[in-house]
Amino acid sequence: MTASTSALITALMEPSRYPHPAPRVERVETHGAWVLLAGEHAWKIKKPVRLPFMDFSTLALRRAACQAEVRLNRRFETSNPATHLYLDARPILGPADQPRFGQAGADDDIAIDWAVHMRRFDEALRLDHLCARGDLKPEHLASLAQCMASFQAAAAAAVATADSVSDSLAFARDNLTTLRDGLNEAGDAAKLEQLSEWTESSFQTLAPLMVQRLKDGRVREGHGDLHLANLVLIGNEVVPFDGIEFNDALRWIDVASDMAFVWMDLLDHSQPGLANGLLSDWLDASGDTSAPDVLPFFAVYRALVRAKVAVIRSAQAGADEAASLKEAQGYTALAQRIAQPPAPQLVITHGLSGSGKTWASSRWLQAEASGRAIRLRSDVERKRLHGLGATQASGSGLNTGLYSPQAHTDTYAHLLERARHLLQGGWSVLVDAAFLRRHEREAFAALANAINCPFHILATEAPLAVLRERITARQARGADASEATLIVLEQQLGWLESLSAAERAHCLPDAA
């Protein structure tokens, strides 16, 4: 820190320096910035540093970084003004020991430094803190899934060159090099060698798909650092913040890489059920059917990034070396678990409309212990096959359009092939569909037998009056993937083929 920078930060600890009420000022320091918390506001000042992955060494670079941070993070704002965290980039006027905040545009030429001006939020509502208190809920992750799917659909797509694909392997190799130098306990070398071999092999297998995803627009200007500590609950919305502005290569990434980071972080926080729900909800919202193929590669990469950061921290002055190295080993162990998933299982639901299949399947996802389970909803996949969004109304009548006999057959065939692909990729699959006819259930049982994985049935029942009440209430609410009506229910009653004794042996207990 230079003398002028030291004087500036010291002076900005005085509440009177701010253009708003600030009873007291708190300082938070990161490797690249100081964040000054003053009343209902936060001011983020870049450190004048040059590191391998960021360069804030000149005033011009710090100004550009502040402006980029505001631009990039404003992309996560919603119609709720409380989510508008990034207010502007402001010039700081001198002298350094008596600073004041100027106006962008008018005072740019006389600035001695720059700051990002933010609306302060309640730190207790960061998702990592919610998780630590046991207050992080499936609906919070559902909000994030929808937020990211909408954001990614609107984000700028990368030009179709192979650079970002080869960058993925280069970054992964760099992580492993740092870890080999920093982790020296017995067994560390062997674990890292296994992860290196897995990384190289997986990349060679996935490279053609990664290139195709690039061509298909799946590489976009993303967040880049999407973990629980960079997400905050505001009202009933989860809002990302602190996206990467300082390194283009870390921001222009496959959309699955952003999602892999928070998915991995949920696993690290021992929340496999929430990880299942997040991924399933995001896949429903985004329709990104090939993301599960590449997500484990990116999740291992993200875990090793966190391990690398912990190793670097262990060597810094004043750091708790033992704790940092233990943290790095924990992330390395998590990377191994992701690279070596448990054997998958196949679960199907069975029940009439309104019997609670989606509710029961959500419970199963939350209870599943590996974090490697994906739900396929027939209501969503049926619409996807016909070019509609998950909650978009089709206008189809009974036995017509999306609900014609042929569309019904096509939907179950599609679900079967998707389940086959996911199971072969090491994902457990829960298929949320009515499965009223025996031959539909038998096709999935045969798939499980062919792949040699466990097969279960999640059966749900409710009295007819309750079914009718639930369907009527769901129609009144609207914005639901299901378009079942009371007329559809009457038709289903004619189709219903009860579970055989052999099928009941596969039923999971306490479904609904």
Would you name each region that the model predicts?
Residues 473-512:
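Small-molecule kinase domains that catalyze NTP-dependent phosphoryl transfer to phosphate-bearing small molecules
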Residues 347-349:
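Hydrophobic anchor at the beta1->P-loop junction of P-loop NTPases
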Residues 360, 364:
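Hydrophobic positions on the alpha1 helix immediately C-terminal to the Walker A/P-loop
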Residues 365-427, 465, 469:
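Conserved substrate/cofactor phosphate-moiety recognition/catalytic segment
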Residues 54-60, 100-109, 116-228, 232-345:
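ATP-dependent phospho-/nucleotidyl transfer catalytic cores
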